[in-house]
A protein has these predicted regions:
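Active-site-proximal alpha-helical scaffold in enzymes
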Residues: 1-20, 28, 84-113, 171-178, ...
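Beta-strand segments within the central parallel beta-sheet cores of soluble alpha/beta enzyme folds
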Residues: 14-19, 95-100, 118-123, 185-196, ...
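Active-site pocket-shaping loop/turn-to-helix segments
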Residues: 23, 30-31, 67-75, 85, ...
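Flexible glycine-/small-residue-enriched beta->alpha junction loops
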Residues: 13-82
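Phosphate/pyrophosphate-binding loops at sites that engage ATP/ADP/AMP, CoA/4′-phosphopantetheine
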Residues: 83-88, 180-184, 213-228, 246-249
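Short, well-ordered amphipathic alpha-helical segments that serve as non-catalytic structural scaffolds
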Residues: 1, 76-83, 99-104, 175-179, ...
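N-terminal extracellular/periplasmic Venus flytrap/periplasmic-binding protein-like
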Residues: 56, 92-182, 245-252, 261
Length: 270
C-alpha cells in the first residue's frame, strides 16, 4: 500500500506496519468455517464439497471448470491438502522441506542474521524479548515424520510441515527515491515491481506460480536474473510446490529459513 501510494503521488514517505496476535484466538477459530448464519448461502454446495473431501479424501478438481463456485470459506489446511492431491507430493518431501526450513533458520539465527531484523522489546517486568521463540532448534526428519495429519485422516499436512500460529509485529519506512536522496538516506532495498494474480481459493498457496512471472514481466526481468527467492511457507506443500513449478533451485529459495520455523503472523507477514 505504501509503495502504491507513493507511485500514485499521494505522498513520498510512509511507515508501513502490521501486527498480529493469533495467540488470542480461540482454539481453531482462525481456521474454522463460519456459522450457518454468517456464510453466504450461495457457497453452501462449495462448503459441502470441501467437507466431503475432508472426510472421505479424494482428488481435488477445480470446481470452476464445471461452472461451480469455489469454496470461499475453506480452511487453509484444507487448501494445503488440495494442493497435495493436485501435485501428488509425498509426505516425506513435505517433511524434508520443513526440516530444511527449521535447520536453515537455526543456522541463520546462530550467525546473527535474524538479529538484524529485530528491535528488542522490554516488558514491564524488565524481561527483554530479542529473539523469535517459534523456531525449533535441532529439528530432525525422524521427529517431524512421527506427527499425525491434522486436517484429513488420510492426509499429509501436519503441525510439523505447516507454519505455526504466531504473534508478531513489523514496521519499515518506505519512501521515494527523490525523498531518500533529499534526506541523504541509502535504501536497504528497492521495490522494482509488484503483481497481483488470481487462482481458485481452494489452492490458494500456489499463487506464486502466476504472481512471480507477472512481477518479473513488469520489471523486464526473467527467472534467471534473480539470485534469491522468498516464498512464504504457509505449508511445505505449497511453498515447495510453487518453487518446483517455477523451476527454482533450492539453493536460491528461502536460504535463511522461512515461516515454517519463524511463524506466519497473518496481519504482519510480508
Amino acid at each position: 500500500m505504501a509503495f502504491h501510494a507513493i507511485r500514485a503521488g499521494e505522498g513520498d514517505a510512509y511507515i508501513s506496519a502490521g501486527v498480529e496476535a493469533a495467540s488470542g484466538f480461540a482454539r481453531g477459530h482462525s481456521d474454522a468455517s463460519p456459522g450457518q448464519n454468517l456464510a453466504n448461502p450461495r457457497f453452501a454446495d462449495a462448503m459441502a464439497r470441501t467437507a466431503r473431501l475432508a472426510a472421505e479424501g479424494g482428488a481435488w478438481t477445480d470446481p470452476r471448470e464445471s461452472g461451480a463456485l469455489p469454496d470461499a470459506y475453506i480452511a487453509m489446511g484444507q487448501t494445503a491438502e488440495n494442493v497435495q492431491q493436485m501435485l501428488g507430493m509425498s509426505r516425506r518431501e513435505q517433511d524434508e522441506f520443513a526440516v530444511r526450513s527449521q535447520n536453515l533458520t537455526e543456522k541463520a539465527k546462530d550467525a546473527g542474521f535474524w538479529s538484524l531484523d529485530i528491535t528488542p522489546v522490554v516488558l514491564p517486568d524488565g524481561t527483554v524479548v530479542d529473539a523469535d521463540d517459534s523456531p525449533r532448534a535441532g529439528t530432525t526428519l525422524e521427529g517431524v515424520s512421527q506427527l499425525q495429519p491434522v486436517f484429513r485422516e488420510s492426509g499429509t499436512v501436519t503441525a510439523g510441515n505447516s507454519c505455526p500460529m504466531s504473534d508478531g509485529a513489523a514496521a519499515l519506512v518506505v519512501m521515494s527515491d527523490a525523498r531518500a536522496k533529499e534526506l541523504g538516506i541509502t535504501p536497504l532495498a528497492r521495490i522494482v515491481s509488484t503483481a497481483v494474480t488470481g487462482l481458485s481459493p481452494e489452492i490458494m498457496g500456489m499463487g506464486p506460480v502466476s504472481a512471480i512471472p507477472a512481477a518479473l514481466r513488469a520489471a523486464g526481468l526473467t527467472m534467471s536474473d534473480i539470485d534469491l527467492f522468498e516464498i512464504n511457507e504457509a505449508f511445505a506443500v505449497q511453498a515447495l510446490g510453487s518453487a518446483q513449478a517455477l523451476g527454482i533451485d533450492m539453493d536460491r529459495l528461502n536460504v535463511n529459513g522461512g515461516a515454517i520455523a519463524l511463524g506466519h503472523p497473518f496481519g504482519m507477514t510480508g
